[in-house]
Amino acid sequence: MLITDEQFASVRGTVMDANPDMAAQMAGRIVDEGLKFVAACAKNPGLGLAPSRIVDEGWHALILHTALYAELCDTLGDQFVHHYPGYDPTNYDPPILDRTREKITELGWEADQELWGPPSDETLASVAAKCQHAPDCTIIITPRPKPGVA
């Protein structure tokens, strides 16, 4: 989709390393949603968006692949999507997640609704990520400074 199959497998492996009991299919779904989330943020700078707790796990895995993540952000329009974690996993604002899913849909993808639920719902997947983003921690994109420009 936005990265090569080899890169995808590597990021999926990172999700599985952090969540040893997780099936490869679920980890792949989480990476897919993380990619969609980053794209939605990069294409909508200035609009506060946030991932669900499960999708945040995929975003974390992408970020750990620093070169891949920087290249992804460049590909998406040179909008580096920074991560500002909110550490209270009970922080949950459904309208922000609704807005984020709408932006994903506007880009031509379908959000995997099962992965965009409340942080307390671990029936589908329990993830290592324990942060949840809320109104005071939505993601606002700022352009990355160009090398040599102060």
Predicted regions and their residues:
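Intrinsically disordered, low-complexity, repeat-rich regions
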Residues: 1-150
